[in-house]
Amino acid sequence: MAVPKRKMSRSNTRHRRSQWKAAVPTLVACERCHEPKLQHIACPSCGTYNKRQVLEV
């Protein structure tokens, strides 16, 4: 198993960890009600997905 030869400094550790960022979710406008919603998920305000009513709202 690979083992670090030297202790990594706090600065280097934090610099490496700073690259791990949460991705910003992509919002699109709903085709029916034009409210912002997540892609590939039913619209929470009108309940449609792919031009079909899938949720009772």
Swiss-Prot record:
Q: Which GO terms describe its biological process?
A: translation
Q: Name the keywords, alphabetized.
A: Ribonucleoprotein, Ribosomal protein
Tell me a GO cellular component. Answer: large ribosomal subunit
Instruction: Name the InterPro entries for this protein.
Output: Ribosomal_bL32, Ribosomal_bL32_bact, Ribosomal_zn-bd
| GO terms, molecular function | structural constituent of ribosome
Q: Locate the transmembrane regions by residue number.
A: none
Q: Does the keyword Ribonucleoprotein apply?
A: yes
Q: Does the keyword Ribonucleoprotein apply?
A: yes
Pfam families recorded for this chain? Ribosomal_L32p (PF01783)
Which NCBIfam families did the record assign? rpmF_bact
Q: Which family does it belong to?
A: Belongs to the bacterial ribosomal protein bL32 family.
**Annotated protein name in UniProt:** Large ribosomal subunit protein bL32
This protein's gene is called rpmF
